[in-house]
UniProtKB/Swiss-Prot annotation:
Protein name: Putative F-box protein At1g49610
Positions of the F-box domain: 25-73
Classification via PANTHER family: OJ000223_09.16 PROTEIN (PTHR32153)
InterPro entries according to UniProt: F-box-like_dom_sf, F-box_AtFBL13-like, F-box_dom, F-box_plant, LRR_At1g61320_AtMIF1, LRR_dom_sf
Origin organism lineage: Eukaryota, Viridiplantae, Streptophyta, Embryophyta, Tracheophyta
Length: 385
């Protein structure tokens, strides 16, 4: 009898749990479609479609989500994408994300992009991890796209027609071909990001008065543009390998984040980098908000060790993204000594161990506060990546 009682109790508990789960599902299902669709748009489309088996209520909810996300990492085939687009009901697509790694799908890509454009897509993300794809001319003429990411490092980005992206405000490219021609067709562009554009010699943004944000990300082997003329930008993010960059005009700059890519101090050409980094510093001396990365600080420490002169900075806020070590401390202290108007200092470190963080506090108390008594606020941040 005791055993029967246990079974009855266990069965009752299972029924209660099941009832509770069903109530949770019902409460979610009672939400308006627009809320459900916003949530489904946060996951890859393949997973969003699976909710159609939950109940009759969910059968078509996914088909009007504002976003479609096709990621080849999830082994999507042509039939799946074609069927998904055929069943999709929304008249407008906010975000269309297409990442294709298999060249077998090459003949179908144009059709998928045309579908997104026919629904007046606003945010278009295209990434192709193979060669031979030639970006079609029709893509260069569009009035609905506001944000465009062309992750086609190995593909051709060479428009044979005029470029007309009349609504585009944010552009990210993995190719340095035809930059001037592309920008000429972006009258209201506000943000430009360039990845691995190592062959670009001169980046002239004089004719883009609305462009306020510029990001340049190089690789360990490449360098990025050699000369930058950007009189209108307010925010600059720069991470290149050899730092072969000369700023011809960044007179409107108010915020800058800079670092260098290299694996070891032994690999760099110290004398050349010292010269170019210090020239960079002088161009940044009037910027309000500065962020320096670990490798950049290492070069500054070399400069300090050789007694080279540093400019005086007008920065009100300074962020240091580095682990505190003997390789960066001299550069940090020199920058702080030359920043009499500094009000806020942020130390963003990769270390999360209590012992290391304790060392950071000691460093601040013994070194930074001694020379920077005028700082109003010091923040510590940590992360693992």
């Amino acid at each position: 009898m005791a055993l029967d009682g246990e079974n009855r109790d266990g069965g009752s508990a299972s029924v209660r749990v099941l009832k509770h789960c069903l109530e949770d599902v019902d409460s979610i299902s009672s939400l308006p479609d627009v809320i459900l669709q916003e949530n489904l748009s946060l996951i890859p489309t393949k997973f969003a479609i699976r909710t159609s088996v939950l109940s009759k209520r969910w059968r078509h909810v996914w088909s009007e989500t504002p976003s479609l996300d096709f990621d080849d990492c999830y082994k999507l085939d042509v039939d799946f994408i074609d069927k998904t687009l055929a069943l999709y009901r929304a008249r407008k697509i906010m975000t269309f994300d297409l990442w294709i790694t298999n060249g077998i799908n090459l003949p179908y890509i144009d059709g998928w992009i045309k579908f997104a454009m026919s629904r007046n897509v606003e945010n278009l993300f295209l990434s192709f991890d193979f060669r031979l794809y030639d970006v079609p001319d029709y893509l260069y003429i569009n009035s609905s796209v506001k944000q465009l990411v062309l992750g086609t490092e190995s593909s051709e980005l060479n428009p044979r027609c005029s470029v007309s992206w009349s609504s585009l405000t944010k552009l990210s490219l993995f190719s340095d071909e035809s930059i001037a021609k592309i920008l000429s067709g972006c009258p209201i562009i506000e943000s430009l990001t360039l990845h691995f554009c190592d062959q670009l010699m001169v980046l002239d943004l004089t004719k883009s008065p609305s462009l306020k944000i510029l990001e340049i990300h190089g690789s360990i082997w490449g360098s990025g543009p050699k000369h930058i003329v950007a009189p209108h930008i307010h925010s600059l993010t720069l991470k290149t390998s050899q730092f072969f960059i000369y700023f011809c005009d960044i007179s409107s700059l108010t915020e800058a984040k800079v670092d260098i890519c290299f694996c070891s101090l032994k690999e760099i050409k110290a004398n050349f980098l010292l010269d170019t980094v210090l020239k960079c510093l002088y161009k940044l001396q009037n910027v309000d908000k500065l962020t320096f990365g670990a490798n950049f600080l290492k070069i500054l420490s070399l400069a300090e060790g050789r007694g080279l002169p540093f400019p005086m900075f007008k920065a009100k806020a300074l962020t240091l993204e580095t682990t505190i070590s003997k390789y960066v401390i001299p550069g940090i202290l020199r920058v702080l000594q030359n920043s009499p108007e500094l009000k806020k200092l942020t130390l963003h470190t990769m270390d999360r161990e209590a012992r290391t963080m304790s060392f950071h506090f000691e460093f601040v108390e013994s070194e930074i506060l001694t020379i920077c008594f005028y700082i109003n606020e010091i923040l510590f941040c940590s992360s693992t990546g």
